[in-house]
Amino acid sequence: MDSAFLKLDAAEFLEIWQRFDADDNGYIEGKELDEFFCHLLKKLGTNAITADKVQGVKDRFMSAYDITADGRLQIQELANMILPEDENFLLLFRRETPLDNSVEFMRIWRKFDEDSSGFISAVELRNFLQDLFLQHKKHITGDKLDEYTDTMMKLFNRNKDGRLDLNDLAKILALQENFLLQFKMDASSQEERKSDFETIFAHYDVSKTGALEGPEVDGFVKDMMELVKPSISGVDLDKFRQILLNHCDVNKDGKIQKSELALCLGLKANP
């Protein structure tokens, strides 16, 4: 779609998003989606808008832009649909491959939570965006950077406290489903549990050192805790991380060896 005809900037995009994501759940879906496409037809100057016309344009655009094929529009999908490319700051977060590992997510989190407060402040978010623009070799004025920072805060800061938490950043980066959800440890035999453990450890041991350290521990803790508490804060994560290290890090080297984690879980790991 040639979205330039709408001549939108980031602030106007925010206004459209907030208007049609009426229930503030992070998606435009159902009746909201129909109302959005009706609005789009009016913007295009379409006369005599009918339900069939709305359905037709909806089918056409959803097949092109609903990347996740879930019948609803996420923020990034809507931005791709209606923002001109030079205004689509969300393109900065587009990745060659989906972010499907919490280890990489936590590496990003630790980098930009500069003061280790458990939150990303507006200043830290501004630095985050500036860093992304530099990575993409794009020049941006200070005023434009401020505008994008403000828009990002309003789009993703769900509780309106002026700072982003883990869940806000997960939405921005489109973090994939929790890796641990596929495992049902309680219903498994001992052999199945050992096999699952090997798969799980290999997933989080991104560096392949035989030990979890730094963001590898963070990623494991995040996914493990979110099995029982779907939305944890950065502060909660740091607490749970320290509890896990106190319990499992027998040799106190700040890492969790494969054998140490197996012992904590009542298993014997393969060498």
From Swiss-Prot:
One of its GO terms (biological process) is regulation of long-term synaptic potentiation. Ca(2+) 2 binds at residues 113, 115, 117, 124. One of its GO terms (cellular component) is synapse. PROSITE patterns: EF_HAND_1 (PS00018), EF_HAND_2 (PS50222). Ca(2+) 1 binds at residues 21, 23, 25, 27, 32. Ca(2+) 5 binds at residues 249, 251, 253, 255, 260. Ca(2+) 4 binds at residues 205, 207, 209, 216. It comes from the Eukaryota. Its main location: cytoplasm. It is found in: Cytoplasm. One of its GO terms (molecular function) is calcium ion binding. Transmembrane segments: none annotated. Keywords: Calcium, Cytoplasm, Metal-binding, Repeat. InterPro entries: Calbindin_Ca-bind, EF-hand-dom_pair, EF_Hand_1_Ca_BS, EF_hand_dom, EFh_SCGN. Ca(2+) 3 binds at residues 159, 161, 163, 168. Residues 8-43, 53-88, 100-135, 144-179, 192-227, 235-271 form the EF-hand domain. PANTHER family: CALBINDIN (PTHR19972), SECRETAGOGIN (PTHR19972:SF15). This is Secretagogin. It comes from Xenopus laevis.
